[in-house]
Amino acid sequence: MIILKLGGSVITRKDSEEPAIDRDNLERIASEIGNASPSSLMIVHGAGSFGHPFAGEYRIGSEIENEEDLRRRRFGFALTQNWVKKLNSHVCDALLAEGIPAVSMQPSAFIRAHAGRISHADISLIRSYLEEGMVPVVYGDVVLDSDRRLKFSVISGDQLINHFSLRLMPERVILGTDVDGVYTRNPKKHPDARLLDVIGSLDDLESLDGTLNTDVTGGMVGKIRELLLLAEKGVESEIINAAVPGNIERALLGEEVRGTRITGKH
C-alpha cells in the first residue's frame, strides 16, 4: 500500500487572496495517478489557499481569549471546514475523471485532537475502503480539540500522514510538494541552495534558514518533524516535486525520482 500526499501548494494557488485551484497541476497529477494505477493507494492532500488563510485569520488552534473570541472562532472553524471540503470535492472530481475510485473522507467527521495532536481517529472505514480496492482521500482540516483552552485545532496533511502511516504501515510514503525536496535554503530565493538527499534527524536541518514557507501547519520544518517521527517507527518517506510532469507517476511506479528521503538515524 502507498500513501501519497499532494501538497496544497501544488494543487492550489496558495498565494492567491481567494481560494483558487491550480487546475493544470491537479488534472495532470490525477492523470499520472491513473496511469500508474497502484494496487492499493490512499491520498492525503493539503488545504492550500482553501484552508490556511481562514485558519490563520481566525487563529484556529491558538488559545481562546474570551467569550467573544470563542464565538468568532466557532464561525472561523465552520468557514474553514466548508472551504477545505470544497477543495476535496475538486480533488475527487479530478480523480474520478481518470477512472480512479476516489472516496472522500472528511477528517473533522472522524478525528478528534488534544492540544493540536490527533487523539482519536476511527480508521476502520479507511481500512474497509482499501480492502475493497477504493482510494480513500483525506485532507488537512479543522477538528474539535479536547483542550479547553483551544477547543479547535488545525490538523495538517502531514500530521495525517504520520498518524495513518503508523497505523496502516504502508510500504511507501510519497510527499509531492512544489520543490524538489528539502534544501539548505529556500531554492526559490537562493540559487546556491543545495538539495539534501537524505535527512536522518533534526540536526540535519541546522543549516536551514527557517522554514521554506511558514504557514499555520508549520511549513517545511513542520513536515520534516512529522516524517522523522514516522521514520523512528520504521516507515521511511520521500519528498519529491509534484509540479514536475511525470514525477508522481514515476514515484508511484517505484522508479527513482530526484528528491529527499526521510530516514531514521543514519
UniProtKB/Swiss-Prot annotation:
Which GO biological process annotations does it have?
terpenoid biosynthetic process
Where do the TM regions start and end?
Answer: none
Per UniProt, where does substrate bind?
A: 47, 52, 157
Identify the domain of life: Archaea
Its cellular-component GO annotations read: cytosol
Q: What is its EC number?
A: 2.7.4.26
Sorted keywords for this record are:
ATP-binding, Isoprene biosynthesis, Kinase, Nucleotide-binding, Transferase
Which annotated residues bind ATP?
A: 5-9, 48, 178, 183-188, 219, 223
Q: Where is this site: Transition state stabilizer?
A: 14
Summary of temperature dependence: Optimum temperature is 70 degrees Celsius, but the enzyme is not stable above 50 degrees Celsius.
Which Gene3D superfamilies does UniProt cross-reference here? Acetylglutamate kinase-like
Q: Which GO terms describe its molecular function?
A: ATP binding; isopentenyl phosphate kinase activity; kinase activity
Activity dependence on pH, as recorded: Optimum pH is 6.8-9.7.
Stored InterPro entries: AceGlu_kinase-like_sf, Asp/Glu/Uridylate_kinase, Fosfomycin_R_FomA-type
Record's catalysed reaction(s): isopentenyl phosphate + ATP = isopentenyl diphosphate + ADP
**Quaternary structure (record):** Homodimer.
Q: Matching NCBIfam families, A to Z? A: IPPK_Arch
Regarding protein family, the annotation reads: Belongs to the isopentenyl phosphate kinase family.
What functional role does this protein have?
Answer: Catalyzes the formation of isopentenyl diphosphate (IPP), the building block of all isoprenoids. Has lower activity with dimethylallyl phosphate (DMAP) and isopentenyl thiolophosphate (ISP). Has low activity with 1-butyl phosphate (BP) and 3-buten-1-yl phosphate (BEP). Has no significant activity with geranyl phosphate (in vitro).
What PANTHER family is this protein classified in? Answer: GLUTAMATE 5-KINASE, ISOPENTENYL PHOSPHATE KINASE
**Protein's name in the database:** Isopentenyl phosphate kinase
| Organism per entry | Methanothermobacter thermautotrophicus (strain ATCC 29096 / DSM 1053 / JCM 10044 / NBRC 100330 / Delta H)
Recall the taxonomic lineage recorded for the source organism.
Archaea, Methanobacteriati, Methanobacteriota, Methanomada group, Methanobacteria
